């Protein structure tokens, strides 16, 4: 084996050391700042092997099916916090039944919350006039797409909301929000 002499070993000068230190610091800060951005663009996945995420009321409490049905009449469309905390309409379809889907209340035009207009029997966006029928299908623009939908299920009296991945029954196409 040959031994290297000190003349063969490159030395790191003070300037090169400071450059590497600065580069490492800036890289670390940049990666730390980019992490939340990357998380934002990563699709949400409902955790666990269960039926989804608990729907929450306006106070952040889990929604129970029996409690919801006892305080909301047939045909009622009221908002809960659904997937990702988005406002989602739960629809009471019978004295003891909630529809198997919920309608995301975020307008597909510019993101306004779309209220239900019971007199017109449709969702009407207050921002730019987009209108959606009772299932959330767009009937008048400028919104380009129907409102997103999510599965609604009941397990142990808890209302659960989960991602809709099947064909959109309103349009016959794959869901755009998936």
Curated annotation (Swiss-Prot):
Keyword match Ribonucleoprotein: no
Subcellular location: Cellular thylakoid membrane
Other noteworthy facts: The Rieske iron-sulfur protein is a high potential 2Fe-2S protein.
Reactions performed catalytically: 2 oxidized [plastocyanin] + a plastoquinol + 2 H(+)(in) = 2 reduced [plastocyanin] + a plastoquinone + 4 H(+)(out)
NCBIfam families according to UniProt: Cytb6fFeSPetC (NF045928), PRK13474.1 (NF010001)
Pfam families, per database record: Rieske, TM_PetC
Keywords: 2Fe-2S, Disulfide bond, Electron transport, Iron, Iron-sulfur, Membrane, Metal-binding, Thylakoid, Translocase, Transmembrane, Transmembrane helix, Transport
Organism: Prochlorococcus marinus (strain NATL2A)
Membrane topology listed for this record: Single-pass membrane protein
Chain ranges of the Rieske domain: 71-161
Name of the protein: Cytochrome b6-f complex iron-sulfur subunit
Transmembrane residue ranges: 20-42
Subunit structure: The 4 large subunits of the cytochrome b6-f complex are cytochrome b6, subunit IV (17 kDa polypeptide, PetD), cytochrome f and the Rieske protein, while the 4 small subunits are PetG, PetL, PetM and PetN. The complex functions as a dimer.
GO molecular function: 2 iron, 2 sulfur cluster binding; electron transporter, transferring electrons within cytochrome b6/f complex of photosystem II activity; metal ion binding; monooxygenase activity; oxidoreductase activity, acting on paired donors, with incorporation or reduction of molecular oxygen; plastoquinol--plastocyanin reductase activity
Bound cofactor: record note: Binds 1 [2Fe-2S] cluster per subunit.
UniProt gene name: petC
Cell membrane keyword on record: no
Cysteines engaged in disulfide bonds, as pairs: 112-127
Binding site for [2Fe-2S] cluster: 107, 109, 125, 128
């Amino acid at each position: 084996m040959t031994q290297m002499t000190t003349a063969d070993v490159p030395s790191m000068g003070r300037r090169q050391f400071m450059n590497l230190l600065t580069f490492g610091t800036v890289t670390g800060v940049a990666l730390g700042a980019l992490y939340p951005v990357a998380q934002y663009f990563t699709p949400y996945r409902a955790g666990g092997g269960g039926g989804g995420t608990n729907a929450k009321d306006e106070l952040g409490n889990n929604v129970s099916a029996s409690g919801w049905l006892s305080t909301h009449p047939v045909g009622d469309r009221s908002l809960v916090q659904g997937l990702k905390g988005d406002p989602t309409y739960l629809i009471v379809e019978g004295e003891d039944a909630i529809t198997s889907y919920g309608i995301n209340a975020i307008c597909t035009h510019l993101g306004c919350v779309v209220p239900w207009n019971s007199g017109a029997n449709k969702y009407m966006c207050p921002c730019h006039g987009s209108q959606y029928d009772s299932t959330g299908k767009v009937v008048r623009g400028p919104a380009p797409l129907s409102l997103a939908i999510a599965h609604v299920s009941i397990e142990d009296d808890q209302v659960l909301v989960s991602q809709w991945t099947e064909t959109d029954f309103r349009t016959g196409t794959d869901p755009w929000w998936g």
